[in-house]
Amino acid sequence: MVRDRVIELFRKALAQGADDGRWPAADAGFSVEAPRDPKHGDFAVNAAMVLAKQAGKPPRELAQAIVEAVRAADTAGDLAGLEIAGPGFINVRLSPDLWLRTLARAVAEGPAYGRTAVGQGKKVIVEYVSANPTGPMHVGHGRNAVVGDGVQGLLRWAGFDVSREYYVNDYGAQVQTLARSVHLRYQELHGRAVTMPPKSYPGEYVKDIAAGLKAEYGARFLDAPEAEWLTLFRDHAVQHVLGMIREDLAAVNISFDRWSSEKALYESGTVDRFLRFLEEKDLVYVGKLPPPKSKKGQPPPQAQPDEEGVTAAEDLTLFRSSAYGDEVDRPVKKADGTPTYFCADIAYHWDKRQRADALVDVLGADHGGYVPRLEAAMEALGASRKDLHVVLIQMVSLMRGGESVKMSKRAGTLVSLREVVDEVGRDATRFIFLTRRSDAPLDFDVELAKKQTLDNPVFYVQYGHARLAAIFQKAREAGHAVPEFDLDAARTLGSPEEQDLIRRIAAFPDLLAAAALAYEPHRVAFYLQETIAAFHSWYTQGKKSGEKVIGPDPVKTAARLFLCRALKQVLANGLAVLGVSAPDRMESPETRDIADDV
Protein backbone atom coordinates (compact mmCIF):
# COMPACT_ATOMS: atom_id res chain seq x y z
CA MET A 1 0.00 0.00 0.00
CA VAL A 2 1.30 3.46 -0.85
CA ARG A 3 0.07 4.64 2.54
CA ASP A 4 2.29 2.01 4.15
CA ARG A 5 5.29 3.53 2.38
CA VAL A 6 4.48 6.95 3.84
CA ILE A 7 4.13 5.45 7.32
CA GLU A 8 7.42 3.59 6.88
CA LEU A 9 9.32 6.74 5.88
CA PHE A 10 7.91 8.83 8.73
CA ARG A 11 8.64 6.13 11.30
CA LYS A 12 12.19 5.83 10.01
CA ALA A 13 12.63 9.60 10.19
CA LEU A 14 11.11 9.87 13.67
CA ALA A 15 13.28 7.02 14.95
CA GLN A 16 16.40 8.74 13.59
CA GLY A 17 15.34 12.05 15.13
CA ALA A 18 14.76 10.39 18.49
CA ASP A 19 18.21 8.79 18.32
CA ASP A 20 19.68 12.22 17.58
CA GLY A 21 17.81 13.77 20.52
CA ARG A 22 15.66 16.08 18.37
CA TRP A 23 12.37 14.81 19.84
CA PRO A 24 11.43 12.39 22.63
CA ALA A 25 9.62 9.52 20.93
CA ALA A 26 10.18 7.57 17.74
CA ASP A 27 6.55 6.51 17.28
CA ALA A 28 3.93 8.86 18.64
CA GLY A 29 0.89 7.23 17.06
CA PHE A 30 0.54 9.74 14.24
CA SER A 31 -2.13 9.42 11.55
CA VAL A 32 -1.73 9.32 7.78
CA GLU A 33 -4.96 10.24 6.01
CA ALA A 34 -6.00 11.37 2.55
CA PRO A 35 -6.94 15.08 2.67
CA ARG A 36 -10.45 16.12 1.72
CA ASP A 37 -9.11 18.33 -1.04
CA PRO A 38 -6.72 16.47 -3.42
CA LYS A 39 -5.04 19.82 -4.15
CA HIS A 40 -3.42 19.54 -0.71
CA GLY A 41 -1.55 16.39 -1.68
CA ASP A 42 -1.94 12.65 -1.48
CA PHE A 43 -1.73 12.29 2.31
CA ALA A 44 -1.74 14.52 5.39
CA VAL A 45 0.40 13.53 8.40
CA ASN A 46 -0.13 14.95 11.91
CA ALA A 47 3.14 13.71 13.46
CA ALA A 48 4.36 17.22 14.37
CA MET A 49 1.11 18.10 16.14
CA VAL A 50 1.20 14.85 18.13
CA LEU A 51 4.85 15.29 19.19
CA ALA A 52 4.90 19.07 19.73
CA LYS A 53 4.03 19.08 23.43
CA GLN A 54 6.59 16.40 24.32
CA ALA A 55 9.23 18.07 22.17
CA GLY A 56 8.49 21.50 23.67
CA LYS A 57 8.33 23.13 20.25
CA PRO A 58 5.58 24.82 18.21
CA PRO A 59 4.02 22.28 15.80
CA ARG A 60 5.02 24.15 12.63
CA GLU A 61 8.63 24.48 13.79
CA LEU A 62 8.74 20.79 14.64
CA ALA A 63 7.06 19.97 11.32
CA GLN A 64 9.94 21.64 9.45
CA ALA A 65 12.45 19.46 11.30
CA ILE A 66 10.41 16.32 10.58
CA VAL A 67 10.17 17.24 6.88
CA GLU A 68 13.96 17.46 6.69
CA ALA A 69 14.30 14.07 8.42
CA VAL A 70 11.78 12.44 6.08
CA ARG A 71 13.56 13.81 3.02
CA ALA A 72 16.79 12.30 4.31
CA ALA A 73 15.06 8.95 4.90
CA ASP A 74 13.57 8.88 1.39
CA THR A 75 16.65 7.57 -0.41
CA ALA A 76 14.50 5.90 -3.12
CA GLY A 77 12.84 9.17 -4.10
CA ASP A 78 9.31 7.91 -3.43
CA LEU A 79 8.07 11.32 -2.27
CA ALA A 80 7.62 14.14 -4.74
CA GLY A 81 6.87 16.85 -2.20
CA LEU A 82 6.44 17.68 1.50
CA GLU A 83 4.61 20.85 2.54
CA ILE A 84 3.64 22.24 5.95
CA ALA A 85 0.03 23.37 6.20
CA GLY A 86 -2.30 24.85 8.79
CA PRO A 87 -1.35 24.32 12.45
CA GLY A 88 1.35 21.79 11.58
CA PHE A 89 0.07 19.17 9.17
CA ILE A 90 2.61 17.79 6.73
CA ASN A 91 1.08 17.32 3.29
CA VAL A 92 2.74 14.56 1.28
CA ARG A 93 2.86 14.17 -2.48
CA LEU A 94 4.02 10.82 -3.83
CA SER A 95 6.23 10.39 -6.85
CA PRO A 96 4.45 9.28 -10.04
CA ASP A 97 6.65 6.18 -10.19
CA LEU A 98 5.50 5.02 -6.74
CA TRP A 99 1.90 5.17 -7.93
CA LEU A 100 2.79 3.26 -11.10
CA ARG A 101 4.54 0.50 -9.16
CA THR A 102 1.25 -0.30 -7.42
CA LEU A 103 0.06 -1.68 -10.77
CA ALA A 104 2.90 -4.19 -10.69
CA ARG A 105 2.03 -5.12 -7.13
CA ALA A 106 -1.66 -5.66 -7.96
CA VAL A 107 -0.75 -8.04 -10.78
CA ALA A 108 2.02 -9.81 -8.85
CA GLU A 109 -0.19 -10.48 -5.82
CA GLY A 110 -3.12 -11.51 -8.01
CA PRO A 111 -6.04 -12.97 -6.03
CA ALA A 112 -4.33 -11.91 -2.78
CA TYR A 113 -4.11 -8.22 -3.70
CA GLY A 114 -6.00 -6.27 -1.07
CA ARG A 115 -5.27 -8.63 1.80
CA THR A 116 -3.64 -6.95 4.79
CA ALA A 117 -2.48 -7.91 8.28
CA VAL A 118 -4.26 -5.17 10.24
CA GLY A 119 -6.16 -7.82 12.20
CA GLN A 120 -2.90 -9.45 13.33
CA GLY A 121 -4.61 -12.83 13.61
CA LYS A 122 -7.03 -11.61 16.26
CA LYS A 123 -9.82 -14.15 16.85
CA VAL A 124 -13.28 -12.76 16.03
CA ILE A 125 -16.65 -14.50 16.17
CA VAL A 126 -19.19 -13.00 13.78
CA GLU A 127 -22.73 -14.05 14.63
CA TYR A 128 -25.29 -13.30 11.95
CA VAL A 129 -28.68 -14.38 10.62
CA SER A 130 -29.68 -16.31 13.79
CA ALA A 131 -33.27 -16.33 12.52
CA ASN A 132 -35.69 -18.19 14.75
CA PRO A 133 -36.08 -21.80 13.51
CA THR A 134 -39.81 -21.34 13.03
CA GLY A 135 -40.02 -20.87 9.27
CA PRO A 136 -38.12 -20.26 6.03
CA MET A 137 -35.93 -17.21 5.63
CA HIS A 138 -37.59 -14.08 4.28
CA VAL A 139 -35.90 -11.19 2.45
CA GLY A 140 -35.19 -9.35 5.71
CA HIS A 141 -33.22 -12.35 6.95
CA GLY A 142 -31.50 -12.36 3.56
CA ARG A 143 -30.15 -8.86 4.01
CA ASN A 144 -28.83 -9.80 7.46
CA ALA A 145 -27.20 -12.89 5.98
CA VAL A 146 -25.49 -11.06 3.12
CA VAL A 147 -24.31 -8.12 5.24
CA GLY A 148 -23.03 -10.49 7.94
CA ASP A 149 -21.24 -12.59 5.35
CA GLY A 150 -19.75 -9.43 3.88
CA VAL A 151 -18.49 -8.38 7.32
CA GLN A 152 -16.84 -11.71 8.03
CA GLY A 153 -15.31 -11.78 4.55
CA LEU A 154 -13.82 -8.32 5.01
CA LEU A 155 -12.38 -9.27 8.39
CA ARG A 156 -10.69 -12.31 6.83
CA TRP A 157 -9.15 -10.12 4.11
CA ALA A 158 -7.91 -7.77 6.83
CA GLY A 159 -6.04 -10.56 8.62
CA PHE A 160 -8.48 -11.50 11.38
CA ASP A 161 -9.06 -15.13 12.38
CA VAL A 162 -12.82 -15.34 11.85
CA SER A 163 -15.40 -17.87 12.98
CA ARG A 164 -18.92 -17.64 11.50
CA GLU A 165 -21.64 -18.47 13.99
CA TYR A 166 -25.42 -18.95 13.94
CA TYR A 167 -27.30 -18.86 17.26
CA VAL A 168 -30.32 -21.18 17.17
CA ASN A 169 -33.20 -20.01 19.39
CA ASP A 170 -34.58 -23.51 19.90
CA TYR A 171 -35.69 -23.29 23.52
CA GLY A 172 -38.29 -20.57 24.09
CA ALA A 173 -41.98 -19.96 23.57
CA GLN A 174 -41.79 -19.49 19.79
CA VAL A 175 -40.59 -23.01 19.06
CA GLN A 176 -43.28 -24.34 21.39
CA THR A 177 -45.85 -22.37 19.38
CA LEU A 178 -44.41 -23.99 16.26
CA ALA A 179 -44.76 -27.44 17.85
CA ARG A 180 -48.42 -26.74 18.71
CA SER A 181 -49.06 -25.48 15.16
CA VAL A 182 -47.59 -28.73 13.83
CA HIS A 183 -49.80 -30.77 16.17
CA LEU A 184 -52.90 -28.99 14.88
CA ARG A 185 -51.92 -29.85 11.29
CA TYR A 186 -51.15 -33.38 12.47
CA GLN A 187 -54.73 -33.63 13.72
CA GLU A 188 -56.00 -32.17 10.46
CA LEU A 189 -54.14 -34.84 8.49
CA HIS A 190 -56.06 -37.41 10.52
CA GLY A 191 -59.36 -35.95 9.34
CA ARG A 192 -60.16 -33.63 12.20
CA ALA A 193 -61.40 -30.09 11.71
CA VAL A 194 -59.04 -27.60 13.36
CA THR A 195 -58.91 -23.85 13.82
CA MET A 196 -55.47 -22.28 13.71
CA PRO A 197 -55.04 -19.67 16.49
CA PRO A 198 -53.98 -16.14 15.48
CA LYS A 199 -50.41 -16.60 16.75
CA SER A 200 -49.85 -19.99 15.13
CA TYR A 201 -47.58 -20.56 12.13
CA PRO A 202 -49.66 -20.76 8.92
CA GLY A 203 -47.09 -21.82 6.29
CA GLU A 204 -47.33 -24.88 4.09
CA TYR A 205 -44.07 -26.14 5.59
CA VAL A 206 -45.97 -26.76 8.85
CA LYS A 207 -48.15 -29.26 6.98
CA ASP A 208 -45.01 -30.92 5.60
CA ILE A 209 -43.61 -31.32 9.11
CA ALA A 210 -46.91 -32.76 10.32
CA ALA A 211 -46.99 -35.18 7.39
CA GLY A 212 -43.53 -36.45 8.32
CA LEU A 213 -44.62 -37.05 11.91
CA LYS A 214 -47.77 -38.81 10.76
CA ALA A 215 -45.74 -41.07 8.48
CA GLU A 216 -43.40 -41.97 11.34
CA TYR A 217 -45.80 -42.19 14.28
CA GLY A 218 -49.24 -42.67 12.75
CA ALA A 219 -52.03 -41.67 15.15
CA ARG A 220 -49.94 -42.27 18.27
CA PHE A 221 -50.09 -38.64 19.45
CA LEU A 222 -53.56 -37.78 18.18
CA ASP A 223 -55.20 -37.77 21.62
CA ALA A 224 -52.07 -37.83 23.77
CA PRO A 225 -51.60 -35.09 26.38
CA GLU A 226 -49.31 -32.25 25.35
CA ALA A 227 -46.59 -33.33 27.76
CA GLU A 228 -46.10 -36.52 25.72
CA TRP A 229 -45.63 -34.91 22.32
CA LEU A 230 -44.52 -31.27 22.80
CA THR A 231 -40.76 -31.88 23.05
CA LEU A 232 -40.76 -34.43 20.23
CA PHE A 233 -42.79 -32.21 17.91
CA ARG A 234 -40.65 -29.19 18.81
CA ASP A 235 -37.35 -30.93 18.11
CA HIS A 236 -38.64 -32.51 14.89
CA ALA A 237 -40.00 -29.16 13.67
CA VAL A 238 -36.83 -27.26 14.56
CA GLN A 239 -34.61 -29.73 12.71
CA HIS A 240 -36.90 -29.60 9.67
CA VAL A 241 -36.84 -25.79 9.62
CA LEU A 242 -33.08 -25.65 10.16
CA GLY A 243 -32.73 -27.86 7.10
CA MET A 244 -34.80 -25.33 5.14
CA ILE A 245 -32.68 -22.47 6.48
CA ARG A 246 -29.44 -24.23 5.50
CA GLU A 247 -30.79 -24.69 1.98
CA ASP A 248 -31.85 -21.04 1.82
CA LEU A 249 -28.40 -19.93 2.95
CA ALA A 250 -26.70 -22.26 0.47
CA ALA A 251 -28.68 -20.53 -2.29
CA VAL A 252 -26.70 -17.35 -1.54
CA ASN A 253 -23.48 -19.29 -0.86
CA ILE A 254 -23.45 -18.78 2.90
CA SER A 255 -22.36 -21.37 5.44
CA PHE A 256 -21.35 -21.34 9.09
CA ASP A 257 -18.49 -22.76 11.11
CA ARG A 258 -20.67 -23.32 14.14
CA TRP A 259 -24.38 -23.61 14.93
CA SER A 260 -24.85 -22.80 18.63
CA SER A 261 -28.05 -24.05 20.25
CA GLU A 262 -29.85 -22.14 23.00
CA LYS A 263 -31.30 -25.46 24.17
CA ALA A 264 -27.78 -26.87 24.45
CA LEU A 265 -26.80 -23.99 26.74
CA TYR A 266 -29.42 -25.23 29.20
CA GLU A 267 -28.81 -28.94 28.74
CA SER A 268 -25.03 -28.57 29.15
CA GLY A 269 -25.45 -26.57 32.36
CA THR A 270 -23.88 -23.43 30.84
CA VAL A 271 -26.78 -21.21 31.91
CA ASP A 272 -26.71 -22.55 35.49
CA ARG A 273 -22.92 -22.08 35.68
CA PHE A 274 -23.31 -18.57 34.39
CA LEU A 275 -25.94 -17.72 37.02
CA ARG A 276 -23.62 -19.02 39.74
CA PHE A 277 -20.84 -16.90 38.28
CA LEU A 278 -23.06 -13.81 38.49
CA GLU A 279 -23.93 -14.60 42.10
CA GLU A 280 -20.28 -15.11 43.05
CA LYS A 281 -19.37 -11.75 41.50
CA ASP A 282 -22.31 -10.02 43.26
CA LEU A 283 -23.69 -8.98 39.89
CA VAL A 284 -27.28 -10.03 40.70
CA TYR A 285 -29.79 -9.41 43.47
CA VAL A 286 -33.47 -10.10 44.19
CA GLY A 287 -35.70 -7.10 43.58
CA LYS A 288 -38.46 -5.59 41.49
CA LEU A 289 -38.42 -3.80 38.17
CA PRO A 290 -39.26 -0.07 38.33
CA PRO A 291 -42.99 0.59 37.84
CA PRO A 292 -44.19 1.67 34.38
CA LYS A 293 -43.85 5.39 33.75
CA SER A 294 -47.07 7.36 33.47
CA LYS A 295 -47.70 10.12 30.98
CA LYS A 296 -48.12 13.61 32.35
CA GLY A 297 -51.57 14.13 33.86
CA GLN A 298 -52.55 10.46 33.57
CA PRO A 299 -52.75 7.75 36.23
CA PRO A 300 -49.95 5.16 36.32
CA PRO A 301 -50.59 2.34 33.83
CA GLN A 302 -51.22 -1.18 35.00
CA ALA A 303 -48.11 -3.32 35.12
CA GLN A 304 -48.00 -5.42 31.96
CA PRO A 305 -45.66 -8.32 31.23
CA ASP A 306 -42.58 -7.24 29.27
CA GLU A 307 -40.98 -9.20 26.42
CA GLU A 308 -39.70 -11.68 29.02
CA GLY A 309 -43.18 -12.19 30.48
CA VAL A 310 -42.35 -10.51 33.80
CA THR A 311 -43.97 -7.53 35.55
CA ALA A 312 -42.88 -4.83 37.99
CA ALA A 313 -44.95 -6.47 40.72
CA GLU A 314 -42.81 -9.63 40.90
CA ASP A 315 -39.68 -10.44 42.87
CA LEU A 316 -37.04 -11.16 40.24
CA THR A 317 -33.34 -11.89 40.10
CA LEU A 318 -31.95 -8.73 38.53
CA PHE A 319 -28.60 -8.19 36.84
CA ARG A 320 -26.88 -4.97 37.93
CA SER A 321 -26.66 -3.66 34.37
CA SER A 322 -27.47 -0.05 35.36
CA ALA A 323 -24.08 0.10 37.10
CA TYR A 324 -22.53 -0.39 33.66
CA GLY A 325 -24.47 2.17 31.65
CA ASP A 326 -27.83 0.46 31.05
CA GLU A 327 -31.08 2.32 31.83
CA VAL A 328 -32.34 -0.21 34.40
CA ASP A 329 -31.28 -3.50 35.94
CA ARG A 330 -32.41 -6.44 33.81
CA PRO A 331 -34.09 -9.66 34.96
CA VAL A 332 -32.06 -12.84 34.53
CA LYS A 333 -34.39 -15.09 36.50
CA LYS A 334 -38.18 -14.98 36.75
CA ALA A 335 -40.21 -15.24 39.95
CA ASP A 336 -40.69 -18.97 39.33
CA GLY A 337 -36.91 -19.45 39.13
CA THR A 338 -36.64 -20.02 35.37
CA PRO A 339 -33.95 -18.04 33.52
CA THR A 340 -34.99 -15.28 31.14
CA TYR A 341 -34.06 -15.11 27.46
CA PHE A 342 -31.65 -12.29 28.32
CA CYS A 343 -29.91 -14.58 30.80
CA ALA A 344 -29.32 -17.24 28.14
CA ASP A 345 -28.22 -14.59 25.67
CA ILE A 346 -25.55 -13.08 27.90
CA ALA A 347 -24.48 -16.60 28.90
CA TYR A 348 -23.99 -17.23 25.19
CA HIS A 349 -21.94 -14.04 24.85
CA TRP A 350 -19.95 -15.06 27.94
CA ASP A 351 -19.23 -18.38 26.22
CA LYS A 352 -18.30 -16.67 22.94
CA ARG A 353 -15.98 -14.20 24.66
CA GLN A 354 -14.06 -17.10 26.18
CA ARG A 355 -13.49 -18.43 22.66
CA ALA A 356 -12.53 -15.17 20.93
CA ASP A 357 -10.84 -11.81 21.37
CA ALA A 358 -13.78 -9.85 19.96
CA LEU A 359 -17.41 -10.40 19.00
CA VAL A 360 -19.53 -9.02 16.18
CA ASP A 361 -23.33 -9.35 16.32
CA VAL A 362 -25.40 -8.61 13.21
CA LEU A 363 -28.92 -7.79 14.41
CA GLY A 364 -32.14 -6.34 13.04
CA ALA A 365 -32.61 -2.63 13.68
CA ASP A 366 -35.52 -3.47 15.99
CA HIS A 367 -32.87 -4.82 18.40
CA GLY A 368 -31.24 -1.39 18.72
CA GLY A 369 -32.60 -0.94 22.25
CA TYR A 370 -31.10 -4.29 23.20
CA VAL A 371 -27.54 -3.20 22.49
CA PRO A 372 -26.89 -1.16 25.69
CA ARG A 373 -27.74 -4.11 27.91
CA LEU A 374 -25.40 -6.38 25.91
CA GLU A 375 -22.63 -3.80 26.21
CA ALA A 376 -23.30 -3.48 29.94
CA ALA A 377 -23.11 -7.26 30.27
CA MET A 378 -19.77 -7.36 28.45
CA GLU A 379 -18.30 -4.75 30.77
CA ALA A 380 -19.71 -6.41 33.90
CA LEU A 381 -18.17 -9.71 32.83
CA GLY A 382 -14.72 -8.17 32.73
CA ALA A 383 -14.47 -7.49 29.02
CA SER A 384 -14.43 -4.15 27.26
CA ARG A 385 -17.40 -2.64 25.48
CA LYS A 386 -15.06 -2.38 22.51
CA ASP A 387 -14.88 -6.19 22.45
CA LEU A 388 -18.46 -6.25 21.14
CA HIS A 389 -19.57 -4.50 17.96
CA VAL A 390 -23.18 -4.61 16.84
CA VAL A 391 -24.12 -4.10 13.18
CA LEU A 392 -27.78 -3.11 12.84
CA ILE A 393 -29.75 -4.08 9.73
CA GLN A 394 -32.68 -1.96 8.59
CA MET A 395 -35.83 -3.15 6.84
CA VAL A 396 -36.07 -4.33 3.24
CA SER A 397 -38.98 -3.30 1.02
CA LEU A 398 -39.50 -5.54 -1.98
CA MET A 399 -40.43 -3.52 -5.08
CA ARG A 400 -42.14 -4.85 -8.17
CA GLY A 401 -43.23 -2.63 -11.03
CA GLY A 402 -42.50 0.46 -8.97
CA GLU A 403 -44.80 -0.64 -6.15
CA SER A 404 -44.01 -2.11 -2.77
CA VAL A 405 -44.97 -5.76 -2.27
CA LYS A 406 -47.12 -6.03 0.85
CA MET A 407 -45.80 -8.61 3.29
CA SER A 408 -47.26 -9.88 6.55
CA LYS A 409 -45.74 -12.45 8.89
CA ARG A 410 -49.07 -13.10 10.58
CA ALA A 411 -50.89 -13.59 7.28
CA GLY A 412 -48.12 -15.82 6.01
CA THR A 413 -47.44 -13.58 2.99
CA LEU A 414 -43.74 -12.92 3.57
CA VAL A 415 -41.62 -13.30 0.44
CA SER A 416 -38.96 -15.90 1.09
CA LEU A 417 -35.29 -15.38 0.36
CA ARG A 418 -35.37 -18.47 -1.85
CA GLU A 419 -38.09 -16.95 -4.06
CA VAL A 420 -35.99 -13.84 -4.63
CA VAL A 421 -32.80 -15.80 -5.37
CA ASP A 422 -34.63 -18.12 -7.76
CA GLU A 423 -36.01 -15.11 -9.63
CA VAL A 424 -33.03 -12.73 -9.80
CA GLY A 425 -30.03 -14.97 -9.12
CA ARG A 426 -27.42 -15.27 -6.39
CA ASP A 427 -25.10 -12.51 -7.60
CA ALA A 428 -27.82 -9.89 -7.96
CA THR A 429 -29.29 -10.78 -4.57
CA ARG A 430 -25.97 -10.46 -2.77
CA PHE A 431 -24.79 -7.32 -4.52
CA ILE A 432 -28.05 -5.37 -4.26
CA PHE A 433 -28.30 -6.07 -0.53
CA LEU A 434 -24.96 -4.24 -0.24
CA THR A 435 -25.79 -1.18 -2.32
CA ARG A 436 -26.88 0.78 0.76
CA ARG A 437 -25.57 1.18 4.28
CA SER A 438 -26.93 -1.59 6.49
CA ASP A 439 -28.50 0.94 8.89
CA ALA A 440 -30.53 2.53 6.08
CA PRO A 441 -33.78 1.06 4.68
CA LEU A 442 -33.38 -0.72 1.34
CA ASP A 443 -35.77 -0.91 -1.60
CA PHE A 444 -35.05 -4.15 -3.47
CA ASP A 445 -36.36 -3.68 -7.02
CA VAL A 446 -36.92 -7.19 -8.37
CA GLU A 447 -37.49 -6.06 -11.96
CA LEU A 448 -34.29 -3.97 -11.98
CA ALA A 449 -32.28 -6.85 -10.48
CA LYS A 450 -33.29 -9.06 -13.43
CA LYS A 451 -32.43 -6.57 -16.16
CA GLN A 452 -29.35 -7.11 -18.31
CA THR A 453 -28.73 -3.37 -18.53
CA LEU A 454 -26.26 -0.90 -17.10
CA ASP A 455 -28.99 0.38 -14.76
CA ASN A 456 -28.62 -2.87 -12.82
CA PRO A 457 -25.71 -2.26 -10.40
CA VAL A 458 -24.39 -5.82 -10.33
CA PHE A 459 -24.65 -6.16 -14.12
CA TYR A 460 -22.82 -2.84 -14.45
CA VAL A 461 -19.83 -4.04 -12.41
CA GLN A 462 -19.73 -7.55 -13.89
CA TYR A 463 -20.06 -6.11 -17.39
CA GLY A 464 -16.96 -4.03 -16.72
CA HIS A 465 -15.01 -7.13 -15.73
CA ALA A 466 -16.22 -8.96 -18.83
CA ARG A 467 -15.30 -5.98 -21.02
CA LEU A 468 -11.76 -6.09 -19.60
CA ALA A 469 -11.57 -9.82 -20.37
CA ALA A 470 -12.76 -9.10 -23.91
CA ILE A 471 -10.01 -6.50 -24.33
CA PHE A 472 -7.41 -9.19 -23.68
CA GLN A 473 -9.17 -11.53 -26.10
CA LYS A 474 -8.92 -8.83 -28.79
CA ALA A 475 -5.29 -8.16 -27.86
CA ARG A 476 -4.38 -11.82 -28.32
CA GLU A 477 -6.16 -11.89 -31.67
CA ALA A 478 -4.13 -8.81 -32.70
CA GLY A 479 -0.89 -10.54 -31.73
CA HIS A 480 -0.22 -8.69 -28.46
CA ALA A 481 1.27 -10.77 -25.66
CA VAL A 482 -0.03 -10.37 -22.13
CA PRO A 483 2.22 -7.53 -20.97
CA GLU A 484 4.56 -7.54 -18.00
CA PHE A 485 5.24 -4.39 -16.02
CA ASP A 486 7.55 -1.90 -17.69
CA LEU A 487 8.07 1.34 -15.76
CA ASP A 488 9.14 3.31 -18.83
CA ALA A 489 6.02 2.18 -20.70
CA ALA A 490 3.82 2.85 -17.66
CA ARG A 491 5.02 6.46 -17.60
CA THR A 492 2.98 7.02 -20.77
CA LEU A 493 -0.18 6.63 -18.66
CA GLY A 494 -0.46 10.37 -18.22
CA SER A 495 -4.08 11.30 -18.85
CA PRO A 496 -6.17 12.42 -15.84
CA GLU A 497 -8.47 9.43 -16.39
CA GLU A 498 -5.56 6.98 -16.37
CA GLN A 499 -4.05 8.59 -13.28
CA ASP A 500 -7.42 8.34 -11.55
CA LEU A 501 -7.67 4.60 -12.31
CA ILE A 502 -4.12 4.02 -11.05
CA ARG A 503 -4.93 5.74 -7.77
CA ARG A 504 -8.14 3.75 -7.40
CA ILE A 505 -6.19 0.50 -7.86
CA ALA A 506 -3.61 1.67 -5.31
CA ALA A 507 -6.37 2.57 -2.82
CA PHE A 508 -7.96 -0.90 -2.88
CA PRO A 509 -6.04 -2.48 0.05
CA ASP A 510 -6.65 0.58 2.25
CA LEU A 511 -10.30 0.58 1.23
CA LEU A 512 -10.74 -3.04 2.31
CA ALA A 513 -8.92 -2.51 5.60
CA ALA A 514 -10.99 0.57 6.45
CA ALA A 515 -14.24 -1.18 5.50
CA ALA A 516 -13.29 -4.16 7.68
CA LEU A 517 -12.51 -2.01 10.73
CA ALA A 518 -15.82 -0.16 10.23
CA TYR A 519 -17.78 -3.41 9.58
CA GLU A 520 -19.19 -1.83 6.40
CA PRO A 521 -19.16 -4.09 3.33
CA HIS A 522 -21.25 -1.59 1.39
CA ARG A 523 -18.07 0.47 1.00
CA VAL A 524 -16.70 -2.23 -1.29
CA ALA A 525 -19.85 -2.20 -3.43
CA PHE A 526 -19.64 1.60 -3.69
CA TYR A 527 -15.95 1.40 -4.61
CA LEU A 528 -16.62 -1.16 -7.35
CA GLN A 529 -19.43 0.90 -8.87
CA GLU A 530 -17.39 4.11 -8.81
CA THR A 531 -14.25 2.42 -10.15
CA ILE A 532 -16.02 0.66 -12.99
CA ALA A 533 -17.78 3.93 -13.88
CA ALA A 534 -14.35 5.55 -14.15
CA PHE A 535 -13.16 2.69 -16.36
CA HIS A 536 -16.20 2.83 -18.67
CA SER A 537 -15.72 6.59 -19.00
CA TRP A 538 -12.00 6.24 -19.81
CA TYR A 539 -12.63 3.43 -22.26
CA THR A 540 -15.46 5.21 -24.08
CA GLN A 541 -13.53 8.48 -24.23
CA GLY A 542 -10.51 6.65 -25.64
CA LYS A 543 -12.58 5.16 -28.44
CA LYS A 544 -13.94 8.59 -29.34
CA SER A 545 -10.56 10.36 -29.19
CA GLY A 546 -8.61 7.66 -31.02
CA GLU A 547 -6.67 6.73 -27.87
CA LYS A 548 -7.95 3.16 -27.71
CA VAL A 549 -6.46 0.59 -25.37
CA ILE A 550 -5.19 -1.38 -28.37
CA GLY A 551 -3.75 1.30 -30.63
CA PRO A 552 -0.95 1.83 -33.14
CA ASP A 553 1.68 2.75 -30.52
CA PRO A 554 3.03 -0.53 -29.07
CA VAL A 555 4.44 1.16 -25.94
CA LYS A 556 1.15 2.86 -25.08
CA THR A 557 -0.76 -0.32 -25.90
CA ALA A 558 1.43 -2.34 -23.54
CA ALA A 559 0.99 0.24 -20.77
CA ARG A 560 -2.78 0.40 -21.16
CA LEU A 561 -3.10 -3.36 -21.31
CA PHE A 562 -1.13 -3.63 -18.07
CA LEU A 563 -3.40 -1.02 -16.48
CA CYS A 564 -6.39 -3.10 -17.60
CA ARG A 565 -4.76 -6.23 -16.22
CA ALA A 566 -4.36 -4.64 -12.77
CA LEU A 567 -7.87 -3.21 -12.87
CA LYS A 568 -9.39 -6.56 -13.84
CA GLN A 569 -7.66 -8.17 -10.86
CA VAL A 570 -9.00 -5.53 -8.48
CA LEU A 571 -12.54 -5.97 -9.78
CA ALA A 572 -12.33 -9.74 -9.42
CA ASN A 573 -10.97 -9.43 -5.88
CA GLY A 574 -13.57 -6.87 -4.86
CA LEU A 575 -16.39 -9.04 -6.15
CA ALA A 576 -14.85 -12.05 -4.38
CA VAL A 577 -14.91 -10.16 -1.08
CA LEU A 578 -18.66 -9.68 -1.56
CA GLY A 579 -19.25 -13.28 -2.65
CA VAL A 580 -20.17 -12.27 -6.21
CA SER A 581 -18.81 -13.90 -9.36
CA ALA A 582 -16.62 -12.11 -11.92
CA PRO A 583 -17.60 -13.52 -15.36
CA ASP A 584 -15.27 -13.22 -18.33
CA ARG A 585 -18.09 -13.42 -20.87
CA MET A 586 -21.47 -11.65 -20.85
CA GLU A 587 -24.03 -10.39 -23.27
CA SER A 588 -23.77 -6.64 -23.74
CA PRO A 589 -26.78 -4.42 -22.95
CA GLU A 590 -27.59 -4.43 -26.66
CA THR A 591 -27.65 -8.29 -26.55
CA ARG A 592 -24.55 -8.72 -28.70
CA ASP A 593 -21.38 -10.45 -27.55
CA ILE A 594 -19.34 -8.06 -25.46
CA ALA A 595 -16.22 -8.85 -27.52
CA ASP A 596 -17.83 -6.92 -30.37
CA ASP A 597 -17.87 -3.83 -28.16
CA VAL A 598 -14.11 -3.48 -27.64
Curated annotation (Swiss-Prot):
CDD domains in alphabetical order: ArgRS_core
Motif 'HIGH' region in this chain: 131-141
Gene Ontology MF terms in the entry: arginine-tRNA ligase activity; ATP binding
A single Gene Ontology CC term: cytoplasm
Keywords: Aminoacyl-tRNA synthetase, ATP-binding, Cytoplasm, Ligase, Nucleotide-binding, Protein biosynthesis
Enzyme class: ligase
Major location (coarse): cytoplasm
Chain spans, region Disordered: 288-309
Catalytic reaction list: tRNA(Arg) + L-arginine + ATP = L-arginyl-tRNA(Arg) + AMP + diphosphate
Keyword Ligase set for record: yes
An annotated GO BP: arginyl-tRNA aminoacylation
Cell compartment(s), UniProt: Cytoplasm
Keyword Ligase among record annotations: yes
EC assignment: 6.1.1.19
Subunit structure: Monomer.
Membership in a protein family: Belongs to the class-I aminoacyl-tRNA synthetase family.
Protein's UniProt name: Arginine--tRNA ligase
